[in-house]
Amino acid sequence: MWTPCIRKTSYVLFNYDNEYLKNLDIRKAISFAIDRNSIIKDAYSNRAKLTNFPLNSTSVYYDNELKPLSYNTENANNYLKKAVLSLSKTDDNKEKDTTDDKDNTDEEKTEADDKATNNKENTSDKKDDKKDSKDSKKGRYFKDITNSEVRALLKDVTFKIIVNKNNSERVKAATIISNNLEAIGIKTEIKDLEDDEMTKALDKKDYDLALIGCELPAVSDATYIIKQLGYDDKQLDKYLNALQNANSEDEIKSTYKTLQKYVKEKAIFISFGILDDYVVLNGRLDGELICNDFNVYRGINTIKIK
C-alpha cells in the first residue's frame, strides 16, 4: 500500500544568455511545440498532474481558469515566422505579442466555454491587429514570412538540452521535447549528465534548455522558484515584491493571479506539473499514514504489525 506525501514540480528552464531564447516569439514557439500531455503520460506514466505554475493546483492561489500555452504546432510555426521579423529588428526587439493564437483550451473545458473564450480572444486579437497595422507599413506581417525564411533563421541554431541521467522520467521527457522541437525545425542535442555535471552545467549556464525540478514548499509560495528562473524583468520583480509585501489574503490572491498571467504571456518557463512521491508500506503492516506537506511520517505511531 502507498500514501502520497511529497509534492515535487518539474519544468524547463531557459538560458536567457542565449540571444534566441531572449526573444519572446522563440520562447512561445517552443512552448506551443512541446506536448506536455504526452510528457505526463509517456515520461511520468501519469504519475503527475499537469500544472502551469509552480504551485499545487489545489492551492487557493493557483489560477485554474488561466488558459495555458498548450500543444499546438500551428501556433508554434506562426511564432517562428514572427521571430523572423522580431529578431531582424535589432533596435526594436520588444516583447510585443500580436500573433493570432488558435484555441488551445484544456480538454476539460466545455464546448460552450470554448466558444465564449474564443469570442473574447478574437475581439482582443482584432484590437491587437489594428494596433500592429501601423508597424506593418514599415515591413511585413508574420503571415507573409515563408518557410524558407524560417529555415534560414534556424539553420545555425541547435539548442542544447541538459538533463540528469539518473532521473529516468526527465530523460524520457527530454527525448519527447527534442522530438517536438525537431518537428517544427528546431535542432537539438540532449546531454545526459551525472549529478555533479548537472550542477556545474547549471552554474556555468552551459545549456540552452534544462530539465530540472524541486520540492514545493509546505506553504504555497512560488516566489523562490520564479526568482531562480533567471528572467531579468522589472515588472516581474514588481509582482514578486508585491507578494512579499502583501497585507491581506485577498491581496495575495490578486497578485498571484496577475503574476501567473504575466508568466504565461512572457513564456518565462515551461511547467510539466506536480509529481507525487509516496511512502510505501509493507502488506504485513496495519494502519494508515495521514502524512501531509509538513510531516511525511505523520501517523506512523499508529502503524502496527499484523
Question: Which sequence ranges carry the predicted segments?
Answer:
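Extracytoplasmic
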Residues: 7-9, 50, 156, 267
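Extracellular/periplasmic solute-recognition and catalytic clefts
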Residues: 1-18, 41
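Append "and occasionally in soluble cytosolic enzymes with long acidic Gly/Pro-rich linkers
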Residues: 22-178
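Short phosphate-binding/catalytic loops that engage adenosine nucleotides
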Residues: 186
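A structural preference for short, hydrophobic beta-strand core positions in alpha/beta folds
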Residues: 3, 161, 190-192
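Detector for C-terminal structural segments
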Residues: 29-63, 169-178, 202-306
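Short helix-initiation/N-cap motifs at beta->coil->alpha
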Residues: 167, 190-200
